[in-house]
A protein has these predicted regions:
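Structural recognition of the conserved hydrophobic beta-strand(s) that form the central parallel beta-sheet
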Residues: 114-120, 141
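A cross-kingdom feature that marks ATP-driven nucleic-acid transaction machinery
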Residues: 2, 34, 45, 49, ...
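Pre-Walker A adenine-sensing motif
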Residues: 3-17
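Conserved glycine(s) of the Walker
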Residues: 31
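Hydrophobic anchor at the beta1->P-loop junction of P-loop NTPases
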Residues: 24
Length: 420
């Protein structure tokens, strides 16, 4: 039984013949190669494309080390273009080729060649798609499996499945593995020996202790507001380290460029402006985050918030942290400015939805706390609170949708539409 990745497969299918280089980005081991070399290749063959017209090269494979030379790669592919008809060139981990931008641009002038490449590092790909391909690159960003993709594969939409997903995440190899000990071992090995080592080697990180401590700090503060100066203060007071703010900023960028972390900016909703700092950071895969901390600190409130962030990004939403400023009366009768937070301000085109993540709303005080910021909004956009447990989905008397977590995970797009 295969894991379906229909959204990404459809994007690849619709991109065929558009005259652009299709650049499939995403963290390592998230399923890019499977998408391109199995799902998409099988689709092409079913459409009648001959196998000798599909030229695939895995550049991570040591057997293809010689093809990491740009001239050798060009010569190899050119030798395979032996007849008329449409050819499909698929290059896996293309950033391993020196001057790969020039190689890819060389194919743009060949009308019967459609090029698809994968890469695992944003510095080498996402930013270069814009600068190097001069508007002729089409990026498709692949994320780890969503909850729905995992639940569909397992045929299991249960509370236990939610808990398992929040613990082990959505890397395909983890989902395919049934043995818990092997899941844990795989995640720990990948986090340490694939993601973090890859970053250290690529950017020549020398301060091993500070680097390791920073990764731990970021794993511990998921969903919390922070910034490089605050982290530097933590190093100084707790770790007795003098690591600079600039070094911390660089290290965070390295993790973002490897698609391990995503940074989320605060947005002043009433003032309609972005607030520079602090930020929130979320992990693209919760299993990697939990593995880094030895599967300790698995606090469900923050795990649910991180999971929802990933689900929203997977359906194409741009996500900010919302800020609403209000005044409250204090004991001496004076008024004091207070900042209220909205977990997710979700934008896609002209659509906007405000979302609060609430693991539980068991008391009136907790309910008021979750609704307080949403009550201050009067712009007509949808307001949602997503709640874990058996809470039924309904709209309250204030026009706020209270949505059960499982209902949302089954069909997130449905709840982001203009009308339910």
């Amino acid at each position: 039984m295969e894991i379906r990745r229909d959204k990404y497969l459809d994007l690849l299918i619709h991109s065929c013949g558009n005259g652009l280089i299709k650049v499939i980005t995403g963290m390592r081991r998230c399923g890019k190669s499977y998408l391109l070399f199995t799902l998409f290749k099988n689709y092409l063959i079913k459409q009648g494309v001959k196998e000798d017209h599909i030229i695939g090269v895995n550049l991570e494979n040591r057997l293809n080390k010689s093809l990491r030379d740009p001239d050798a790669l060009l010569q190899y592919i050119d030798s395979r273009l032996s007849s008329d008809g449409q050819y499909y060139v698929m290059l896996d981990e293309v950033q391993m080729v020196s001057e790969f931008e020039d190689v890819l641009n060389s194919f743009l002038s060949i009308s019967n060649v459609d090029v698809f490449v994968t890469g695992s590092n944003a510095k080498f790909l996402s930013k270069d798609v814009i600068t190097e391909f001069r508007g002729r690159g089409d990026e498709i960003h692949v994320r780890p499996l969503t909850f729905r993709e995992v639940a569909d594969f397992r045929d299991d939409y249960s509370q236990d499945m939610i808990r398992e997903y929040m613990l082990y995440g959505g890397l395909p190899q983890v989902v395919l593995e049934n043995d818990v000990n092997k899941k844990v071992s795989y995640l720990e090995q990948q986090m340490e020996h694939t993601y973090l080592r890859d970053i250290k080697e690529r950017y020549e990180v020398r301060q091993d202790s500070d680097w390791s401590e920073l990764v731990d700090i970021m794993a511990s503060c998921v969903g919390g507001l922070t910034n490089p100066p605050k982290i530097a203060d933590t190093f100084k007071s707790v770790k007795h380290s003098s690591i600079s703010v600039d070094t911390i900023r660089l290290y965070l960028e390295y993790m973002e460029d490897a698609f391990v972390l995503e940074r989320v900016t605060r947005y002043d909703i009433k003032g309609r402006k972005y607030i520079d700092s602090p930020f929130k950071y979320y992990f693209e895969d919760l299993g990697l985050r939990n593995a880094r901390l030895g599967f300790r600190q698995v606090e469900p409130t923050h795990m649910m918030e991180n999971m929802l962030y990933n689900e929203l990004r997977a359906i194409g939403m741009k996500v900010d942290v919302g800020q609403v400023f209000t005044e409250v009366k204090i004991e001496d009768g004076s008024r004091q400015r207070k900042t209220l937070e909205i977990d997710f301000v979700c934008n896609r085109g002209y659509e906007r939805v405000y979302i609060q993540s609430a693991y539980a709303m068991e008391t009136e005080e907790k309910r008021d706390q979750e609704l307080a910021s949403l009550r201050k909004l009067r712009d007509g956009f949808r307001r949602i609170v997503i709640v874990n447990g058996l809470q039924p989905t309904y709209m309250n008397e204030e026009g706020v949708y209270i949505i059960n977590l499982m209902d949302f995970l089954r069909a997130p797009e449905k709840y982001m539409e203009e009308r339910l």
